[in-house]
Regions:
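Residues that form generic nucleotide/phosphate-binding pockets
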Residues: 7, 11
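Conserved alpha/beta-domain cores
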Residues: 12-243
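Conserved glycine-bearing catalytic or ligand-binding loops at nucleotide- and phosphate-handling centers
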Residues: 1-6
Length: 243
């Protein structure tokens, strides 16, 4: 929790420093325009304030509400949470990442103790092993998206094509369940993965046939390529994404 509070303070300070430039177009010298999207989930009030100045939400960290509660949020609680974000940016894409816990992100009501947590049970590995957690969350996302149609679903810590296939199967199942519940066809979200595991770089041609987009998770990808724990002060000096 302290780490996220620190991140909130950093984001607010960086935004204050960039206030003078925020209304300028994000444009290359060639004239090509670049879309600027927000990493969200830390400060809803701040995100709403920036709404008109950005092109959407590139990453919404759904694990934060999970971490702030004493137990798993219900499907209804999650619907309300995601609906607020999707409606706030209803004419822009919003990318919701499925529950990404483990390693340095722990749930107080689901402690995970491992000798090497960075290489252990985390991200999509947890939610595919506990499919009810995944199904409840995805149903909530799809229900929240029923009226807006601007949802992208992002899968974290993917290590194999089998994980992508299984996640897509569960998302399709959740979609059928939601349609049966509400009685009409719902918009189909775009589905993507976080590219964080080095081996998946070599699987890109196969991934491209299975997903709609790929988001590069530079923090973990750098950590795994360099074999450096970025949170370990003894070796943090050699954690360099430019290497």
């Amino acid at each position: 929790l302290q780490e996220y509070q620190r991140l909130i303070s950093e984001e607010i300070e960086l935004s204050r420093l960039a206030e003078d430039d925020v209304n300028l177009p994000a444009q290359l010298k060639s004239g090509e325009r670049i879309k600027v999207m927000l990493n969200a989930g830390l400060s809803p009030e701040h995100e709403e304030k920036l709404g008109s100045r950005i092109d959407g939400i590139g990453l919404y960290r759904t694990e934060i509400p999970f971490m702030l509660q004493s137990g798993f949020p219900s499907e209804e609680e999650q619907v309300a949470q995601y609906q607020g974000m999707l409606q706030m940016f209803n004419d822009k894409p919003v990318t919701l990442r499925t529950l990404d816990v483990g390693a340095d992100k722990q749930l107080p009501y689901m402690p995970i103790s491992e000798e090497n947590p960075c290489l252990g049970w985390r991200g999509i590995r947890i939610t595919l092993d506990q499919p009810e957690i995944f199904l409840i969350q995805v149903r909530a996302m799809l229900r929240a998206n029923a009226a807006t149609g601007n949802l992208n679903i992002l899968l974290p810590m993917v290590t194999s094509l089998d994980e992508v296939d299984e996640a897509r199967r569960l998302i399709e199942r959740a979609g059928r369940e939601v349609e049966e519940m509400i009685g009409y066809e719902i918009p189909k979200p775009r589905i993507g993965i976080m590219l964080e595991v080095p081996s998946m770089v070599f699987m890109l041609p196969h991934l491209a046939k299975r997903v709609d987009f790929i988001s590069v998770g530079t923090n973990d990808l750098t950590q795994y390529i360099l074999a450096v724990d970025r949170n370990n002060t003894r070796v943090a000096n050699i954690y360099d994404s430019l290497h």
